[in-house]
Amino acid sequence: MSKDQIIEAIKEMTVLELNDLVKAIEEEFGVTAAAPVAVAGGAAAEGGAAEKTEFDVVLESAGGSKINVIKVVREITGLGLKEAKALVDGAPAPIKEGVAKEEAEEMKAKLEEAGASVELK
């Protein structure tokens, strides 16, 4: 299979399929797709005391009422039932990335009200 064929196959995948692919690659090769902490720390130090304006809403766990959390995830993301369930089952997982502070806090409140454990990054 050529590099171009692999890229074409990846283009046709859904977000959840890509997430599964990344996890499989991480397990197979013993690597991680996470950015090194030193790079993130350096970027934060350069920014000084500037307030963060964009946040990532990360679902840490669904808690006891998984069904309610799935409903809220569907409402927030617009995903289908299967995709929302896979996202909740795959926690910790980002729900939305690069959202304004106010919107991120609203999402966090909705998810926590449904019983989820959520972190803003």
From Swiss-Prot:
Keyword Ribosomal protein tagged: yes
UniProt KW Disulfide bond keyword: no
A GO CC term attached to the entry: cytosolic large ribosomal subunit
Record keywords, A-Z: Ribonucleoprotein, Ribosomal protein
Pfam families: Ribosomal_L12 (PF00542), Ribosomal_L12_N (PF16320)
Any GO BP: translation
UniProt xrefs under CDD domains: Ribosomal_L7_L12
Entry GO MF terms: mRNA binding; structural constituent of ribosome
SUPFAM superfamilies: ClpS-like, Ribosomal protein L7/12, oligomerisation (N-terminal) domain
Subunit structure: Homodimer. Part of the ribosomal stalk of the 50S ribosomal subunit. Forms a multimeric L10(L12)X complex, where L10 forms an elongated spine to which 2 to 4 L12 dimers bind in a sequential fashion. Binds GTP-bound translation factors.
Family indicated by similarity: Belongs to the bacterial ribosomal protein bL12 family.
PANTHER family: 39S RIBOSOMAL PROTEIN L12, LARGE RIBOSOMAL SUBUNIT PROTEIN BL12M
Function as written in the Swiss-Prot or TrEMBL entry: Forms part of the ribosomal stalk which helps the ribosome interact with GTP-bound translation factors. Is thus essential for accurate translation.
Protein name in UniProt: Large ribosomal subunit protein bL12
Organism name: Halalkalibacterium halodurans (strain ATCC BAA-125 / DSM 18197 / FERM 7344 / JCM 9153 / C-125)
Gene designation per UniProt: rplL
